[in-house]
Amino acid sequence: MTEAFSAIHELGGIRGIGGIRGIRRSSYWQQKFLYLFLFQDHFYGIVYNSFVNESEYVRNTTIHGLTYGFNFVMLKHLMKKLHQSQSPSILFDELTNQSQFVREILMIASNPILQPRSRDSAGRINEWNGYQSIHSVFPFIEDRIHNPSNYLDITIPHCVHPEILIRICRKHILDISFLHLLRLMLHTSNHFRIPNSSNRVINLFYRFLWNFCTQSIEYCLIHLWKQIYKFQCTPFWFLFDKTEFIRKIQSVSKKSNPRPDRTISRKNCLIHYVRSQNHLILVIDGEGDFESIKDWKILFIILWSKYLHSWLDPCRISVKNLSNNPLSILGYILYTKNDLIKIRIRFFDFSINTSLVIKGFCGIIPIISLIRSLAKEGFCNTSGRPICKLSWTTLTDNEIIYRFDRIMRNIFYYYSGCCKKKGLYQLQYIFRFSCAKTLACRHKSTIRTVWKRYGSNFARNYVVLEGVKSIPSNLWQRESDEKRFWCLTITQTNFLADLLRKSKNIYSVG
């Protein structure tokens, strides 16, 4: 046992936590070291090395699941306290800092074992193309899905039974003691059963486990897709009917009653898969997409029940048509429309005009749902009438204008890919008068006084304040209502899109 600890100590001092996976697995007992060193003093050095960049000696907080600072002194004291304590209540009292550090230790210890395997699998099958921008999802849908009609809408439940997570982790972690500790923490925690808890620090640990569970399902689906659809799609426009060809052969060979072959060459189906948080979308582009979607619905239910050993509620998975049921994702409402394109076909001595009808994606701004979200945030009432933002009346004028300016910019750029942007003018009206009422309430004056001071059109053309960039007066009229453009620099979801995701009436179209 001392040899194992010495090996771990050397790896922790030289390579950090990344060296844990480099231990030789020549014997059976070397695979069961995780729980043994979990609360030892040697783990202090390993954790410290994982947070420090060896080249620049700076703190590194990019470990999966940890986005805040880590107190190593408290970690050191916690290890000593765990050695002296005889009661396990210190591990599972969620109101104490000790329990928080235990969860952080579990995330750090399981991160190099669970997370890199997913990356290795993704690199081996070469399935993912990494995009940092959220708006890159929509050009991908427009470019890849040529003839969309039906799609599979799946809602993955947030509440997963603890034993399901233990069963999945058992395939990657061979340490039985570590799994027992993980099981004990999951069963004694109430926050895991309530995923919408306000305690963000506690939810980080369960979010890490939930993401790992979801990724396991994803890679199972990818493996099935690789087995079923083995060939690459060769795009072509025409279908070859062999009937006329057989008739010509009949006239040459003079065979009696040949049986014409009416087989039609069809291109292979393409599967497009998009997931945003717990919202999963599956689209099949090809012939017979409706039958294929129904088959994949049954297959997904069977996979969920066999792999996770739990029953998926059928109401969470449904087959929808893009023409009748628009696709709602990331705060956008997408539907298909027929675009008529006029083309000219030129022959040797004449030319003809014809039309080509193609289906394309079109985005709509969910105005009704956005107004309800703004009403919850205190910018307007439920009918869309602007009100004063009372929580901002204690701020300075520059800060109030800057916040409204930033929100308007984010909303405009986030919904710049929609076909019809007339709904943005209604949001502009709400923010304009809400900002004016907030400033008037702060100075105990009227809106007319605010307009005299900053101008009646200040919400569209803010005065240049120190540290505040003004919005150009033609920003909202620069592009036509039908012209779309995607901002590929957006890396975070708009806060209104997050509110729409939680809203029940997300499919309301304004």
UniProtKB/Swiss-Prot annotation:
One MF term in the entry's GO annotations: RNA binding
Species for this entry: Aneura mirabilis
Pfam families reported for this sequence: Intron_maturas2, MatK_N
GO CC terms in record: chloroplast
Protein name: Maturase K
Family the entry assigns: Belongs to the intron maturase 2 family. MatK subfamily.
Gene of this entry: matK
Superkingdom: Eukaryota
Function of the protein: Usually encoded in the trnK tRNA gene intron. Probably assists in splicing its own and other chloroplast group II introns.
Record's keyword terms, sorted: mRNA processing, Plastid, RNA-binding, tRNA processing
